[in-house]
Amino acid sequence: NESTAHFQAHYFLLPQKDLNQNGKNIFLMKVFVQGKGAISNKIFISDSEYAFQRANDITFMNSKVYMMFVGGMFSAFLIFLSIFLFNKKCREYLDFSMMNLCSIGFILSFFASDLPLYTSMCIPNLIFFKFSFCICALLSVFFTSSFLVSFFGEKENSVVFKIRLVLLFVEVFLIASSSDFWQLQTSMKVCLVLCVLSMIYGICFPFRKIFQKENRKNAVILMIAFFPSVCSFLFDFVNKFILGDLLLPFTSVFGWQITIVI
């Protein structure tokens, strides 16, 4: 089965006897991809001590830094799921717990190379990436939208819920049926558009409630809580997808943690 370092830095030792100490060194590097791939950062040759430290710095900023969030989200998942099981009328606790669980699945993709299940080659890279980075992200959006509605103690309109559920099934099918990363990238663009439709419904709910005196306080609290997530998501969209920056970590993950804590 194939594997990749994902968001971690690649560090290779080159035998000194194979290097030209007094001139240029030209290397041929083959990148094996499933549909699409590239070298994501600048390549340099240096002493092993510096290269090793630099690789560790890049790996920490783009991969290992996310590990610290998993424990908190898993605790939140267990706590709020337990509350829901004792009080099943409060649907918001179930939505919030599932939102945390799906977020954990998404974050796992950032440090997959440190997971025994992945490094032992039990799961092919494409399948792991489909489930963790893509499907878990789609599920997180679905449950977040549900939470924005159930937070006010209201039951979601059955027709709207069925429409969102159908959209979710379509998104999961598109991701699961992608045969390589090129097709997966195309499918994910379509899924993001469908996610926006689902999320708009959830976001509009607190905005509508802010005009109702009895719900205004909860609406303001919810809007304040999600403000860091919205700002960090917009920053990542500009920084990652427009400017193409590869060094800074995904700030939306940090913004999402602030939202969960609030």
Task: Pin down the residues of each PLM region.
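An acidic-aromatic loop/edge-strand motif
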Residues: 4-71
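First transmembrane helix
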Residues: 55-87, 188-212
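Hydrophobic H-region at the start of alpha-helical membrane spans
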Residues: 70-74, 97, 166, 223
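Juxtamembrane interface at the cytosolic side of transmembrane helices
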Residues: 76-105
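Interfacial "cap-and-anchor" motif at the non-cytosolic start of specific transmembrane alpha-helices
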Residues: 104-262
